[in-house]
Curated annotation (Swiss-Prot):
PROSITE patterns: RIBOSOMAL_L31E. This is Large ribosomal subunit protein eL31. It comes from Caenorhabditis elegans. One of its GO terms (biological process) is cytoplasmic translation. One of its GO terms (cellular component) is cytosolic large ribosomal subunit. It comes from the Eukaryota.
Amino acid sequence: MAPKNEKKSRSTINEVVTREYTIHIHARIRGIGSKKRAPRAIDEIKKFAKIQMKTNDVRVDTKLNKFIWSKGIKNVPYRVRVRLSRRRNEDEDSAQKLYTLCTYVPCTNFHGLTNVNVDSEE
């Protein structure tokens, strides 16, 4: 077999990036008991962010947490628009180099929205 002449490209996992997603929470917490719906919704958002951004360290912003809990523990909003930011960890002694910050994006109508790469404000 002939050797490959292609160069290895740089991994995109190590880059700092920001994206916006719509998460359909209603489908993810279907069948969960009424007193565990809001905590499970937070867990599902963290799981979604972990898969999409490929980081183990996921942090949820307080505004997103308050939006999920705004209608109580039982009546979680059906959908939420979130901004996932993969960032560099400032701690020198941390195990992971990168973490993901989940922030809330206010949205009234979810129709026609797609996943969007956002230019970094930093």
